[in-house]
């Protein structure tokens, strides 16, 4: 196995006390956020569950700012997600907007990669993002934890893999210090998400 399983991600969410508002892990058929009056988060795979999944992204809804935050560890645009994975987040955003009173949702997303394409750590980075959304529901990308990551232009072959590799260490250090489930299962989790797991550079 490579990457993170749904069960592992759910256990880390529980270990970090991020269950409040967490809707769960979903495949590409995630319906979007329906209840607009409460804070919600979700981890979504770009592939169908029956095929084992492909790539994890994370979503957060803040009712105060009326913003939906979308985090993709690889920083892909909607067009790139469609090209590489056959996945589009546009429908999720539209479904969320249709369920709101004014049918209007502001989408804020990261535009740079923080994960190297050689690693299987997308699920773990999603956990870090949910933690940032817990710290600052209206500005998760502005937290000091998220800002400690070095953003790079997205691409199958990273321009500066060394910087992205440092992000992976920041990620592991964060989980090691905050997440008891990670500490208990670190050997297997790191083995399945490690750098150079996939040959991209």
Swiss-Prot record:
Tell me, which GO biological process terms does this entry list? proteolysis
**GO function terms (MF aspect):** cysteine-type endopeptidase activity; DNA binding
Give the primary localization class.
Answer: virion
Supply the alphabetized keyword list. Autocatalytic cleavage, Disulfide bond, DNA-binding, Host nucleus, Hydrolase, Late protein, Protease, Thiol protease, Virion
Induction, per UniProt:
Expressed in the late phase of the viral replicative cycle.
Does the record carry Translocase as a key word? no
Record field: catalytic activity? Cleaves proteins of the adenovirus and its host cell at two consensus sites: -Yaa-Xaa-Gly-Gly-|-Xaa- and -Yaa-Xaa-Gly-Xaa-|-Gly- (in which Yaa is Met, Ile or Leu, and Xaa is any amino acid)
Subcellular location field: Virion; Host nucleus
Gene3D superfamilies hit by this protein:
Adenoviral Proteinase, Chain A
Q: State the top-level EC class.
A: hydrolase
Q: How is its activity regulated?
A: Requires DNA and protease cofactor for maximal activation. Inside nascent virions, becomes partially activated by binding to the viral DNA, allowing it to cleave the cofactor that binds to the protease and fully activates it. Actin, like the viral protease cofactor, seems to act as a cofactor in the cleavage of cytokeratin 18 and of actin itself.
* CC annotations in GO: host cell nucleus; virion component
Question: Which InterPro entries does the UniProt entry name for this protein?
Answer: Papain-like_cys_pep_sf, Peptidase_C5
- At what residues does the UniProt record annotate the site feature described as Cleavage? 52-53
- Would you identify the family this protein belongs to, as annotated? Belongs to the peptidase C5 family.
Further remarks about this protein from its record: All late proteins expressed from the major late promoter are produced by alternative splicing and alternative polyadenylation of the same gene giving rise to non-overlapping ORFs. A leader sequence is present in the N-terminus of all these mRNAs and is recognized by the viral shutoff protein to provide expression although conventional translation via ribosome scanning from the cap has been shut off in the host cell.
Subunit text: Interacts with protease cofactor pVI-C; this interaction is necessary for protease activation.
* HAMAP family for this protein: ADV_PRO
Q: What does this protein do?
A: Cleaves viral precursor proteins (pTP, pIIIa, pVI, pVII, pVIII, and pX) inside newly assembled particles giving rise to mature virions. Protease complexed to its cofactor slides along the viral DNA to specifically locate and cleave the viral precursors. Mature virions have a weakened organization compared to the unmature virions, thereby facilitating subsequent uncoating. Without maturation, the particle lacks infectivity and is unable to uncoat. Late in adenovirus infection, in the cytoplasm, may participate in the cytoskeleton destruction. Cleaves host cell cytoskeletal keratins K7 and K18.
This one is known as: Protease
The organism of origin for this protein: Snake adenovirus serotype 1 (SnAdV-1)
């Amino acid at each position: 196995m490579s990457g993170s399983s749904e069960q592992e991600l759910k256990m880390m969410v529980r270990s970090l006390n991020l269950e409040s508002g967490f809707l769960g892990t979903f495949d590409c058929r995630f319906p979007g956020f329906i209840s607009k009056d409460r804070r919600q988060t979700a981890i979504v795979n770009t592939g169908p569950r029956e095929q084992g999944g492909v790539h994890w992204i994370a979503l957060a809804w803040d009712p105060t700012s009326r913003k939906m935050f979308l985090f993709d560890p690889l920083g892909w645009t909607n067009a790139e997600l469609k090209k590489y994975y056959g996945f589009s987040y546009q429908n999720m955003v539209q479904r969320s907007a249709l369920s709101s009173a004014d049918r209007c949702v502001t989408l804020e997303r990261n535009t740079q990669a923080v994960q190297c394409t050689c690693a299987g750590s997308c699920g773990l980075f999603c956990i870090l993002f949910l933690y940032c959304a817990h710290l600052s529901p209206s500005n998760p990308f502005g937290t000091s934890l998220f800002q400690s990551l070095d953003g790079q232009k997205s691409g199958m072959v990273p321009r500066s893999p060394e910087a992205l590799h440092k992000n992976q260490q920041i990620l592991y250090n964060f989980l090691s210090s905050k997440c008891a489930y990670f500490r208990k299962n670190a050997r297997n989790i790191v083995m399945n998400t490690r750098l150079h797991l996939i040959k991209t550079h």
